[in-house]
Amino acid sequence: MLIRPYQPSDWDATYQVCLETGDSGLDAKHLHTDPKALGNIYVGAYLRFEPELAYVLEDEQGVCGYVLGALDSKRFYERYLREWLPPLQQTHAKPTGDRSKWNPSAQLHALLFEPEMVYQPKLVNWPAHLHIDLIARAQGKGWGKQMIDRLLADLIERKSSGVHLGVSTRNDRAIGFYQKMGFAEIMRDGPADDGTIYMARGLP
């Protein structure tokens, strides 16, 4: 396997990795009628705005993981709201009716109009953030640590004072992994059984 900088030709493959890890780290293909719904929320803006902070993991079968970074989270989310979402709002219908009956893709389409990915002022001391996903065949082999280390080196070179990330409260494996990488819990958001834990660490 090889860690290399993201290239524009990797766009579709990174979206596919997001889909194959979109159920708290497990494959979510069976859950979604729109295979791009997850990537539109969690991947595309990073590739568009800060491709220099994106790396992919590749083996003989193709791209099997990625790590994405944003140097200044406040600025990133401002651009996310101002530049990324409006074109998607033009090409997707806002879900209506009983929210409890929406399928997973509809729930994500709703986030195009009522975004949850917004700047968290409580994380101001850790201004950068990252997002990493590896599909099953790439997990448990140490590649996740290497990819995060690569991105952290970039953030340190750019004088970042700290970095944070969000992880599902249901993803115990990922939480343990991030703790081993030096991340500590800062805050929680949403319901206890299906919310987000924000973890952070200082740099360097």
Enumerate the predicted regions with their spans:
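Conserved catalytic-core motifs of GNAT/GCN5-like acyltransferases
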Residues: 74, 164-166, 179-199
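Active-site rim helix/loop that mediates acceptor-substrate recognition in acyltransferases
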Residues: 21, 32-54, 60, 115
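Conserved GNAT-fold acetyl-CoA-binding loop/helix
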Residues: 23-42, 79-93, 97
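Conserved acyl-donor/pantetheine-binding loop and adjacent beta-alpha core of acyl/acetyltransferases
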Residues: 74-131
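Conserved GNAT acetyl-CoA-binding A-motif
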Residues: 126-128, 155-168
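A short beta-loop-alpha structural element at the N-terminal edge
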Residues: 2-16
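Conserved active-site alpha-helix within GNAT-family acetyltransferase domains
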Residues: 125, 130, 141, 145-146, ...
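Conserved beta-strand in the GNAT
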Residues: 56, 62-71
